Amino acid sequence: MKKQKNMSAVHLTKADFLTRVAKYEANPNEWKFLGERPALIDFYATWCGPCKMLAPVLDELADEYAGQVDIYKVNVDEEEELAALFGIRSVPSLLFVPMNGTPQMAQGALPKKNLKEAIQNVLLKND
């Protein structure tokens, strides 16, 4: 029996970000991750070709890593404050947020193999 795909990347608004990722307004000088699992956040635009190519890959990864990693998407045109906060100048930009430690940013539509390696090495490694 084939496993049914049911997980996909979750779109975040500023309000969602403040409850699921970080309350940056309350703690502007300190990163305090609020998530229950490590996260990968895709900063994208609807008009961006590479972003459109990356979207189904992120949905596949959301399914493969369900319960281990949360995969989020932030539309930079709708959430300009979040884009500015993270200094997003090009899309797609991917923010890897481990449970402990400093988030790491990557640019471009990375191949699925590279994304899986980053998830394993940055998000799921045991400190």
Give the residues covered by each predicted segment.
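N-terminal targeting signals for export/organelle localization
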Residues: 1-18, 124-127
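A short beta-strand-turn-helix
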Residues: 13-39
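Acidic phosphotransfer microenvironment of two-component signaling modules
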Residues: 15-18, 80-81, 113
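Thiol-based oxidoreductase modules, predominantly thioredoxin-like and allied folds used
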Residues: 11, 43, 55-81
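Non-catalytic, surface beta->alpha helical segment in thiol-disulfide oxidoreductase systems
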Residues: 90, 95-127
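A short glycine-leucine-enriched loop at secondary-structure breakpoints
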Residues: 85-89
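Cys/His/Pro-rich metal-binding microdomains
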Residues: 49-52, 95
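Short pre-active-site segment immediately N-terminal to redox-active cysteine/selenocysteine motifs
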Residues: 36-39, 43-47, 90
